[in-house]
Amino acid sequence: MEGLTFNINGGYLEGVVRGYKNSMLTPTNYQALTQCENLEDLRMQLSATDYGNFLANEPSPLATSAIAHRATLKLVSEFEYLRDNATAPLSKFLDYLTYSYMIDNVILLITGTLHGRDTHELLDRCHPLGWFDTLPALCVATNVEELYRTVLVETPLSLYFRDCFSSSDLDDLNIEIIRNKLYKAYLEDFANFCQSIGGPTAESMGELLAFEADRRTINITINSFGTLLSKTERARLFPSMGKLFPGGNNALAKADELDQVKGIVESVPEYRRLFDDNSIAGIGSVSYTHLRAH
């Protein structure tokens, strides 16, 4: 029944998204890019694609930072067009996608400020999808309560800060604890929202968000080895969802070394090849190919 009425509210934007997909670079385009000897060659190769205009006004010599900046602006422009034309529940879904960027921007600013980084440089590094009006004021916050009261109370992140007030001082360890508490609350909230929509959204996003929750649980476990973070506090940072939850989470909360983590994670069939390269460094960038393989 849902399919019969989908086009009433979603048909136009689905067509827009399909257009975005069709404009993406093809394997042939990427093969041509591998033959480029410099960035001007890259600009010339892109000129024959749908990306032909996004570097047209960039002066020579072309810089890699300019390419990254223009590509980000293109992504943001296309995303904002979708959000501006969406109706509920799609509009709310797209809002949720920006919350992770907000969290990253908040942590970037308070960490950079703690270490005396230039405010303007920090603001320039913030992702546009995570921008909100009071973001610059984060640079003067000295504790969690002030951070919430003066900056975040009017943002969507305010609901996720309820469990953060035990960390009153903004030092490196507490900032990392705040980051993980925010992500825990965000992922659980996003998952509940997707389940409330039901249908393909609940099914597809359930898989993706469960994987993201497990990835964060694994990262928190490994990164806490050799730190002042207690096992009890570590367990509180784990999202209450995912294929590892609850048994795997409980076991990871007690783990002391990587081999134990590996054994626990490999108990989940989808994750048996996760540690194949035996690389701790690779865990932080685990890709969703592990989902597609199953």
How would you label these PLM feature ranges?
Residues Y96, L122, W131-L135:
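Long, charged all-alpha helical bundle/coiled-coil segments in cytosolic proteins
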Residues I103-G116, R215-L228:
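Extracellular/lumenal glycan-associated surfaces
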Residues S91-Y99, E203-F211:
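Short, recurring structural edge motifs at helix starts
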Residues E2-F79, P89, H115, H127-L173, ...:
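Conserved hydrophobic core element of enzyme catalytic domains
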